[in-house]
Swiss-Prot record:
This is Maturase K. GO terms for cellular component: chloroplast. It is found in: Plastid, Chloroplast. InterPro entries: Domain_X (IPR024937), Maturase_MatK (IPR002866), Maturase_MatK_N (IPR024942). GO terms for biological process: mRNA processing; RNA splicing; tRNA processing. It comes from Backhousia citriodora.
Length: 503
């Protein structure tokens, strides 16, 4: 935000809500690419100078408003070699600049929200791992859960109408509408839907999707505010660019008759919880399945009549938590019963009391993770390590550091697993794949490589957590079990590794 504040004079734009002129500022496209103007995509691909991007954007916008914006004459291609490139580049130029602009009012409201709520450590709440302590605390007391896939077919006009709450500039909204209709086919995948969380997804569409989800989840916040007369704990919504997180405590009986074609009833449920991650959401409750069914049909009517997205009720399944596993964010989570026997003696009578307690467990699913490693050529489909092809000029230290970085990132992300057996197998695959890669480069056998490198090579693959724990605890059977079940959640993880994002 400090970078935006210096460039854009946000106080003035906040008063007038007029963002259209920012499309023709050079520094907008420098911010979009996160580096200087000398290395912008406009100068790299077209050979233009530092101050040519605004001219190109003006020409693209002019052609967009014409009847045939994608038809370029032969003279234009000769005089301007930029227009001879792929048409996808044109849409990329405008979309990246547009994304920076429309995020300005969104960021301003986010900052004001955090200041109003006096949230000092909002960065910790932005971590992906911050969801799991909440699940451990709440889900062990719940009975039923629904894993909902949020519809991805979103009408273009719905996206524009959603953005009207954030941007009040009519010129920007008109340009956005033209842009979406003209370049829709070049910005989406061949399957005609948005791949929302892929690496190559345009930044603008991520923002539009998050704004759309924000409006959907604001209805939950509205219900929580309407039930303020009930005894409830404070909760709120924390906005991010990609992930949204909200916790709902109480609901009260209300009904809508404006946006829906039927009356919907909501009953008080003090144990209803909601979590969204990427394009999916989880609803969990302690009450009977009847209440979960009511929420199921509420979601169906919400998407169909308010957002005009076709949604089948059969896509929402209600399951018992004790018999169901949740696969999300690279973990497989479930609620299991842990039995413990307590021996009690009163005078001459001996009693054995069997206590069953629910515990929320998170493990690493090994089969999908091996599939990701296989696609990245670290192993075959059966999990056997293989050597990776390397460049001839790559040094041994570069190859080792690359494998170490991948191994430590995976260990860091999966540190919350209650069982480390799957994680140890992944580390074994990466370590042996590194050895085979180096042996292939030097044209020697694996045994010869181990004789030259010694045991120091294996110690490099130990993570910092394992080194610290091995120094604190003596190497006994109890300490190894403690190391095997040690769980750690980190509040600095804001993105998912490509090998983990196999969903």
């Amino acid at each position: 935000m400090e970078e935006f504040q210096g460039y854009l004079e946000l106080d003035r734009y906040r008063q007038h809500d007029f963002l259209y002129p920012l499309l023709f500022r050079e520094y907008i496209y420098a911010l979009a690419h996160d580096h200087g103007l000398n290395k912008s995509i406009l100068s790299e691909n077209a050979g233009y100078g530092n101050k040519s991007s605004s001219i190109i954007v003006k020409r693209l916008i002019t052609r967009m408003y014409q009847q045939n914006p994608l038809i370029f004459s032969a003279n234009d291609s000769i005089q301007n070699p930029f227009f001879g490139h792929n048409k996808n580049l044109y849409s990329q130029i405008i979309s990246e600049g547009f994304a920076v602009i429309v995020e300005i009012p969104f960021s301003l409201r986010l900052v004001s929200f955090l200041e109003r709520k006096e949230i000092a450590k909002s960065k910790n709440l932005x971590s992906i791992h911050s969801i799991f302590p909440f699940l451990e605390d709440k889900f062990s007391h719940l009975d039923y859960v629904s894993d909902v896939l949020i519809p991805y077919h979103i009408h273009l006009e719905i996206l524009v109408q959603t953005l009207r709450y954030w941007v009040k500039d009519a010129s920007s909204l008109h340009l956005l509408r033209f842009f979406l209709h003209e370049y829709w086919n070049t910005l989406i995948t061949p399957k005609k839907y948005i791949t929302l969380f892929s690496k190559g997804n345009p930044r603008l569409f991520l923002f539009l999707y998050n704004s759309h989800i924000c409006e959907y989840e604001s209805i939950f916040l509205f219900l929580r505010n309407k039930s303020s007369h009930l005894r409830s704990t404070s909760s709120g919504i924390f906005f991010e660019r990609i992930y949204f997180y909200v916790k709902i405590e109480h609901f009260v009986k209300v009904f809508f008759d404006n946006d829906f074609q039927c009356i919907l009833w909501f009953f008080k449920d003090p144990f209803m919880h909601y979590v969204r991650y990427q394009g999916k959401s989880i609803l969990a409750s302690k009450d009977t399945p009847l209440l979960m069914n009511k929420w199921k049909y509420y979601l169906v009517n919400l998407w169909q009549y308010h957002f005009y997205a076709w949604f089948q009720p059969g896509r929402i399944n209600i399951n018992q938590l004790c018999k169901y596993s949740l696969d999300f964010l690279g973990y497989r989570s479930s609620v299991r019963l842990n039995s413990s026997v307590v021996r009690s003696q009163m005078l001459e009578n001996l009693f054995l009391i069997n206590n069953a307690m629910k515990k929320f467990e998170t493990i690493v699913p090994i089969i999908p993770l091996i599939g990701s490693l296989s696609k990245a050529n670290f192993c075959n489909t059966l999990g056997h390590p293989i050597s990776k092809p390397t460049r001839s000029d790559s040094s041994d230290s570069d190859i080792i550091n690359r494998f170490l970085r991948i191994c430590r990132n995976l260990s860091h992300y999966h540190s919350g697993s209650s069982k480390k057996k799957s994680l140890y197998r992944v580390k074994y695959i990466l370590r042996l794949s590194c050895v085979k890669t180096l042996a292939r480069k030097h044209k020697i056998t694996i045994r010869t490589f181990f004789k030259k490198s010694g045991s120091e090579f294996l110690e490099e693959f130990l993570t910092e957590e394992e080194v610290v724990l091995s120094l604190i605890f003596p190497r006994t059977y109890s300490s190894s079990r403690r190391l095997y079940r040690e769980q750690s959640w980190y509040l600095d993880i804001t993105s998912i590794n490509d090998l983990v994002n196999y969903e």
